[in-house]
């Protein structure tokens, strides 16, 4: 049926994702990919993937928009590309159009992003883009 048989908080996450107009997912890069916490949450959508792609029953019918924000201490594009591919797969499962992304390399410490006004400006612009796209999805 596309729902996980494990009784934990993923059912709350599924409900929120079903109801949302937009989703911005953010994660740091650890060991060349998404954080373990982010990845395990995405892995819990495997039941939804099976439902949509094997059983042909889409439990995330509502169209939505989405974006991905990712930070890394390293300046490795391949790390970001790896994370992006995982997030794009999630967005396909939940019917979210991948509207944009923000990759912020060179960030090691908490608050360090404040030294990079270009990252802050890009994050603001991405937020405006996602809000506009979500508004366009709502019925008039």
Predicted segment positions?
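Glycine- (often His-adjacent) and acidic-residue-rich active-site loop
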Residues: 1-3
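Helix-loop-strand module that forms the ligand-binding subsite of alpha/beta enzymes
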Residues: 5-92
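Glycine-rich phosphate/pyrophosphate-binding loop and the adjoining helix
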Residues: 88-140
